[in-house]
Amino acid sequence: MKSRTILAFDFGTKSIGVAIGQEITGTARPLTSFKAQEGIPDWQKVEKLLSEWQPDLVVVGLPLNMDGTEQPLTARARKFANRLHGRFGVAIALHDERLSTVEARADLFERGGFKALDKGSVDAASAVIILESWFEAQH
């Protein structure tokens, strides 16, 4: 089995979290987060991440309502994924991200209390949860 390097994005209109993982181990770790202006990232930062890590696949979290229906942010996350593919030619997978932020907050709080709950840490941790959930769904 070939080990693929996979980047995951937790898309948001104000901030985007990023994680990196290896498919063969099914593990991920937080990389970074960066600000977005109304959902538009600094594309130079995105390009730098993609060229540095050279992922075989990019997973973008898809924000859905608890009943699985789409919300306004869902279309924006899809648009972000389409732009990633269009600009950089990377393979894209969309993955349900319901409750990833809640889980990330709980994990971070457990490890470091309120001090660990800064926005960037939460977004990057959410990207880890999205990617690990995607790994689990593949098996």
From Swiss-Prot:
Subcellular localization(s) per the UniProt record: Cytoplasm
UniProt keyword Cytoplasm present: yes
Example of a GO cellular component annotation carried by this entry: cytosol
Domain of life: Bacteria
EC number: 3.1.-.-
Chief place where the protein resides: cytoplasm
Alphabetized Gene3D superfamilies for the sequence: YqgF/RNase H-like domain
Example of a GO MF term: nuclease activity
Matches recorded under InterPro entries: RNaseH-like_sf, YqgF, YqgF/RNaseH-like_dom, YqgF/RNaseH-like_dom_sf
Keywords: Cytoplasm, Hydrolase, Nuclease, Ribosome biogenesis
GO biological process: rRNA 5'-end processing
Record-linked HAMAP family: Nuclease_YqgF (MF_00651)
Family assignment from sequence similarity: Belongs to the YqgF nuclease family.
Function (record text): Could be a nuclease involved in processing of the 5'-end of pre-16S rRNA.
This protein's name: Putative pre-16S rRNA nuclease
Gene transcribed to yield this protein: yqgF
